[in-house]
Amino acid sequence: MKIFSLAGAGLAAGAAALAGLAAAAALHRHPLPSALLIRGVFSSANRLQVKRIQPRIPGFTVTRHRGLRYLGTGGKPSLDLFLPATDRKPLPVVMWIHGGAWISGSKEDVAPYLEVLAGYGYAVVGVGYSISPEAVYPTAVKELNAALAFVREHADRYGLDPNRIVLAGDSAGAQLAAQLALAVTNPEYARDTGVVPAAAPGQLRGILLNCGVFDFDAVARMAGPVGWGLRKALWSYTGSKNWKATPAAGHMSIPEHADHRFPPTYICGGNGDNLTLTQSIPLADRLQELGVPVVRQFWPEDYKPALGHEFQFQLHRPEAMDSLLRTVAFLEDVTGVSALPRRPLEKVIALEEDLLAELPAIEEKLAA
């Protein structure tokens, strides 16, 4: 799910165009055409996102272990592991799940950001997983649980601390991370969903949720191109046009199942993202009502310039830098491990004149 400015301008511009195609009969008969159209919009936005961020990452020394097959030699999904240059072992683990409305995206889309996070002294895992319509619910959830098992089983080999794990995700990845956290911390939920959690509750120290989708009753009522796009994606992901009536939709709804056992949470969303008012803020409120420690980061509705979906990856923006530094502070708090000292990133990453010159072309490409 992306309403984006970068990933932000993508859905806002792209979903409006896609909504116009919704009148085509093919889009009503089968989820595949809609899913592939939405996937195309997201893929274009994600490529531009990586292009903009990667050259502007400070030179942290990070060891990269790419393409680790967590399902064994026969399993296609893989994960990437980014390790900081430090003798301090074992390292707390951040397991990041990428977004893409359950129908698009890849771990490569968030890799530059994860390298920055690893530079602060944490082992950061970017997990790839099967997307729909090729794979439907609950394939992704079970794969992500297997990835969690892989991290624990290979902790000694890579110098990881299996007792200090933080789940994380953006957009649909935030929903998947929250669902996995429910399975780890709530045995009744795990039993109902058929997930045998790969970690004990005490090993999960916290969760990072950026711009997620959590309440599917709200999605069913959501107006405009964003609501249209999400409902088409859920048709594809659940395998049913009547997705709201499926067991999958019930399992995926986080507020319905969360209780006081849910892990400490950092939750963030931009004021220009439709999902903030309908999803992130209500979940933050609900978790606090339940007594869960919550760090909230939101902006006033009239804040300018508006912060779109997944603005956190736009490291040229001071608000994204603030989000990153608050993320690191949250990791320090929940893991009990101090971050490595770094030069303030705002001194290293700037919005150069050449990037400003690129913006009109980027926006035109996204709109097309």
Language model features with spans:
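Alpha/beta-hydrolase superfamily serine-hydrolase fold, recognizing
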Residues: 3-368
